[in-house]
Each structure stands twice: as structure tokens, then as C-alpha cells.
Amino acid sequence: MTRAYLAFTEKGLALAQKLAGALPGTVDRCGHGGPGLADWAAEQFARADALIFVGAVGIAVRAIAPHCQNKAVDPAVVVLDECGHFAVPILSGHLGGANDLARALAAVCGAVPVITTATDANGVFAVDTWARHQNCAVLEPGRIKRVSSRLLAGGPVRYRSEFPIAGQAPAGVVPAGEAERADFALTLFPAGDALHLIPKIGVLGIGCRRGTSTAQLEAAFAQFCAAHGLAAVCITAAASIDLKAHEPGLLEFCRAHGWPVQFYSAAQLQNAPGQFTPSAFVRSVTGVDNVCERAAVLAAGGTIILPKQAGNGVTFALALRPFAPDWRWQDA
């Protein structure tokens, strides 16, 4: 988590520096040769994962108001008074982690964390906090309220998962029966009207002809996801053979999706563990019988879940990093 602290007084600056000593981040003082409030808020709202104001809540609210979008993208915002008595999360308490951050900041300076979200106030399972702890994307943030409201009303919520979840489920959270509708689902392949939580564990293996354009890769990727019902947000990285390390179309495709891309030699790919879809043609060109599956496995350190799909000179395969979810949803 990248953090940015802003203070307004000498006393506040001393507290911000103390907090940053324990929870590192940039520290600025508004005015006195430092940044202006509006400029600082605009820059840090776009850059940082968390903004920490040491000052009045009203100042922080006015500073961030022009930049707030929605709970899926807004950073965590926490305000502490300059004496360090209270730590108040005011934005992105669950998905952004502001509630947990407020507790952590409070522990550093002896403040009282002032947590106002209903699930936390009532000691009820917060599905969006759980998703963040399990490194999952929330596909439909608007459906969070439905799950939380049901738990707050005392009713059970039902879930489905493609992965075994360690530990005991929180109170009120029960597995959905075969014929029952799930309220939320831990899945790579969303379907229906449940709240879908997507583990960010996928690595996309890529093979392509020389000169393949970004547009061709995008079209093939859309077909790949549609054919399998795959949530593309599960993918966090890509991999291919080193022969493609300077392909402009492939590099731009990965950059546009925000994926780091790892390239491997034919010898490295040949030593990838597992069974792969062989191609004599691919071997004749690259020196190894399969690029996309082998590259995905090496980069993920896991196994193939979607084998090679080929079309229009592009091949994709998906491997998963090891993933062991549990029912932890609060920081210890």
C-alpha cells in the first residue's frame, strides 16, 4: 500500500512523521513552502493507495470531494486529529482498506479508531473486506450492499466457491445447496446475479505470429474470455517466449492491460513441468512444442486451467498461481 500523509501544523507534522516511521509513506505539510491542499489531494488521489490527513475531518472532506468516484477505485482516506486522539476512516473503509489502516495508525499513536461502517459496528462479516484480504476483485460493487444488508438483518447469506476455503465460515455465512441461489461466489467464471469475487491469480500465456497487432491480440483475447466465460480481471501477468520480447503489438497489448510480461527461452520452456498441447509447427519455428501453456505455467508457478486456444495466428492459455483462501476477514 502506498501512503501519503498531509499535515497542517508543526504538531500535526510531528505526528505524521511518527506514523510514517511505522507505516511508511510520503509526508508533506500544507503551505509553508509545501504543496497546496487542492493540488496535493488531486495528485495523491490519483497516485496513492491511501491518503492520511492529520487535521480536521472537514478539511479532508472538502479536499477529496472533487475526486471521489466509487468504492471500487477510490483510495483509502483516514483522518487523525493532530493530538493523535482519534483515527477516522472516511472513504473506502472496506475495499480500500481504510478501516484496517485506521486501526493500524491508531495502534502506532494510541488513538481510538472510529469505525462507522455498519458491518464493523455490529461485528458482522464484511464480504468486501474479506475479498480484499483474499486478493480478490469485486466484479459488481453495487451488489455488496445486498449481502451486507441480509447479514445485518440477521438472515443467512449463501456462497459458492470453486476453491476450498480453509477455516470456519463466519456466523450467518453458509454454503449454497445445489438448487439454491448463491448470494456471493468465489469464482473465475461469473454467472448469474450473485456478487462475484474474482481471485487475482491468473497468468496469461501468449503465442503469436511475428507482426501480430495489438488489435488482433485484443480481438483474440475477447474471444478467449467469451468462449470460457472467464473474468479477465483474474489475470495479473502475462508470459511468452523470448523471441517475442520485442513484438510491439504484444508489448502494447500487455501494457494496456497493466500486466507485467515475462519472457522465457526455448530451453526454459522445454523444462516446464506438466503435460502440454504439442505442435510440430510451433517446434519448427521456436524450438519448443508449445509456447503459451509452458510460459503460463512457468510464470504462475502453478497449473494450467484453460489450455491452448488458437485462432488467427494467436494462442492463449491460462495458468493459476497457488491460491489458498481462508475465512480471515479482519486484521489480527
Q: For each predicted feature, which ranges?
A:
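N-terminal basic/disordered segments at the start of proteins
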Residues: M1-T26, I305, N312, A319, ...
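Conserved mixed alpha/beta catalytic, RNA-binding, or beta-rich assembly cores of soluble enzyme
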Residues: G12-K18, G34-G36, Q44-A46, A50, ...
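Donor nucleotide-activated moiety binding/catalytic core segment of transferases
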Residues: A41
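C-terminal non-catalytic interaction/assembly regions of soluble proteins
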Residues: A237, I241-A296, A300-I304, K308-V314
